[in-house]
Every structure is written in C-alpha cells, then in structure tokens.
C-alpha cells in the first residue's frame, strides 16, 4: 500500500493531503499556503523530514484521541495526522508516513 500526495486549491489557498493509495484514507494534512509554490515546498519538506523520528510529535486531542504532527527542522508543523482510536494506531500511522512519504508521487489537483 503506497502513498500519494494530493495538491489542492481552495479559493486562493493551497494545501495537500498525503493519502494511502490503497484505500484513499487521508493520513497527513498540511496547513494552508498562500501560493502553489509554497505548498509544493511543503510536500518536499514532508518527504525530507518523514524518515526521522525526532520530527514527529505524539499528541492527544481534547477529546482524548491520539494524533501526531510532523515538523520541519525549524520546528514548524508541516503536517497533521487524522485522529486515531489508540496510541498503537497512531504509532502505525507514523510508521506508514516514514515508509511511504519519501517516495510518494504528487497528483496536482489544482
């Protein structure tokens, strides 16, 4: 099960999702960017930072659901996961991103 980045436009802003190519599930969502070029740089940053454990922050939402963020070397969040049902599921999500994000192609849906 590989991954794919979907680059999208919403009004005047751009964003991307990293999805499982197998089931289409969104695994990681970006912040919104003002330019397409910045969103593409965000995808490149996810690919570059995904392999490194230190770039992941394991967090818990206000409703108790575990999730994670992926950060760049400067500490800026470059992607936020879905909410998971357990810490094990969240950790599996991190492993999936580490494995599939670096080589995932981009589908430009703008």
List PLM regions with ranges:
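Charged, low-complexity amphipathic helices and coil/IDR segments
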Residues: 1-4, 102-103
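Charged, amphipathic alpha-helical segments
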Residues: 1-2, 47-55
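Low-complexity, intrinsically disordered or weakly predicted helical/coil tracts enriched
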Residues: 6, 89, 105-106
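A structural feature that tracks compact, well-ordered secondary-structure segments
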Residues: 8, 15-21, 27-33, 42-45, ...
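A generic "cationic amphipathic patch" detector
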Residues: 29, 52, 102-103
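C2H2-type zinc-finger recognition helix
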Residues: 36, 87
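Alpha-helical recognition helix of canonical C2H2 zinc-finger domains
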Residues: 39, 90
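Glycine-rich beta-strand-turn "strand-cap" elements at beta-sheet edges
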Residues: 98-110
